[in-house]
């Protein structure tokens, strides 16, 4: 059976190739994961912040009905009851309005979709009013019956690919994606989201599904909806959650022919570097030399909703909002470097790793509160609103596809490079000051450092950098400064 599935996978490869295109609007790059936000709040954020600040896309939490769990943990969203679009984030009408409003301001929507499994035992009723009996594998809201699932068995050996793909992940009832009826229901669900104007999908737990089955599902999806500004013939961008740190039976290379993958090695490696376990000088060959998938197959991130809580991969090396200086440096590097498709995390604060989003009453999600400096309160972290991050999204948009040039390092933890002649960044992760004359590659003039401040008319709210006629500038980053990074670009010239 595995050989037959492999043949099907290869046959559909040409169809899948269209799924590497992010479908971003021209001149934009980078997406943000607004984790557990409500649809109405995301729509407003697209219009008021994401669009004006150059973000290209927003990843949203699962949109379909999920099991209601005691204490309302975040992970209940990953326990489907049906494919009805009804969650704590809102209903179908609100979701459709959000997608339309975001598309109108150039921000594409990417849905976190869960179809590896259905809810585990205890998930008997859902956010949309549906009921289920997970113990008997009955989910009338779809409907699914026991005929649509793999036999009950637990995953205990990640060196056994059959077990990983055919058994149950932490008790979640494992759907059989090789079943034609299951394929029909999944395609129907995804096509409905495409009709509503989404640009792509993050496929949860892709590692736990056979690549050949995924190839069939992806190959059957309709083209994107041209009513939402997509080019005729466009296909949904597919990014698959495949945790591959090496040493297991399943490899990300089995999935990169079908779509992009979540490159967890990027998160692990960038955390080690900016935590000081590896030196910044070694970043000179950042990319596939570090064991990453190809650039157009890699969705890259500093942290995600799983590994910031110690789940997934990376462990204690993962950087989160709780170590803000290093987190901002790592995020700035990710956005300054051309490798991969970057995704910015936008979190809610937590002390308990099961803790759900802020609520008004223990159940209904609370809206973020916005402060005058663009930051959030009310339990929301909103890293995407940190100046050091959103200004680097603008940096990335400004430099476009220009190559890395003028690399410099001090043989330790101070580095700098330009992106052609359009942007320049410098980093200091040493315990002493960076104070050097460096080649920026930029035209002569005075520039606003978009890390310490922002350009405002003809002035700068932060540090300024003067570039000489030879392209060189005196760069200073004190080891005790709040930010260990400096960035200038041609659109920040004063």
UniProtKB/Swiss-Prot annotation:
CDD domains: AmyAc_bac_euk_AmyA (cd11317). GO terms for cellular component: extracellular space. Changing residue 156 to R: In strain: 1420#1, JP-169, JP-186, JP-190, KO123, KN-3, KN-9, KN-10, TN22 and TN256. Disulfide bonds join 46-102, 153-167, 376-382, 448-460. GO terms for molecular function: alpha-amylase activity; calcium ion binding. The active site is at residues 204, 241. GO terms for biological process: carbohydrate metabolic process. The modification Pyrrolidone carboxylic acid is found at residue 19. Residues 1-18 form the signal peptide. Chloride binds at residues 202, 304, 343. Changing residue 403 to A: In strain: 1420#1, AO168, J87, JP-60, JP-169, JP-186, JP-190, KO123, KN-3, KN-9, KN-10, TN22 and TN256. Ca(2+) binds at residues 116, 165, 174, 208. Changing residue 410 to S: In strain: Berkeley, JP-5, JP-35, JP-55, JP-65 and KN-12. Its EC number is 3.2.1.1. PANTHER family: ALPHA-AMYLASE (PTHR43447). Monomer. This is Alpha-amylase B. It comes from Drosophila melanogaster. The gene is Amy-d.
